[in-house]
């Protein structure tokens, strides 16, 4: 039970990181559409896309026998409830690393989605 304002303040203070430990990270959420009919792609296409991304060094995240995401280093690509995918990027030191990570991710996505 909270009995004082100081308890709340101390709780938030306990989560403060030192400046030397600051990092940045990116998240990209993508809704994917079929260019032939402009409809959202279904799980079977996402499964194909995830399988193709394995060639870029991604590792599968499985639920039973279904691939529901990928990881590589500190990055994850996950299947979200609306059938969209989301990249959760690595913890990086500066914006230039985040830019490079985004460019690499988008390059890989373009390579595999053009073949679907």
Positions of PLM-derived features:
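Terminal catalytic/cofactor-binding subdomain
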Residues: 1-116
């Amino acid at each position: 039970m909270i009995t004082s304002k100081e308890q709340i303040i101390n709780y938030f203070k306990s989560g403060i990181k030192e400046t030397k430990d600051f990092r940045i990270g990116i998240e990209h959420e993508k809704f994917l559409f079929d260019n032939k009919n402009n409809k959202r792609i279904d799980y079977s296409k996402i499964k194909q896309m995830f399988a193709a991304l394995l060639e870029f060094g991604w590792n599968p995240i499985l639920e039973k026998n279904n691939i529901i995401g990928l990881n590589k280093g500190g990055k994850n690509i996950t299947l979200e409830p609306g059938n969209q995918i989301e990249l959760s990027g690595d913890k990086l030191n500066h914006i230039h690393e985040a830019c490079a990570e985004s460019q690499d991710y988008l390059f890989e996505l373009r390579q595999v989605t053009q073949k679907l």
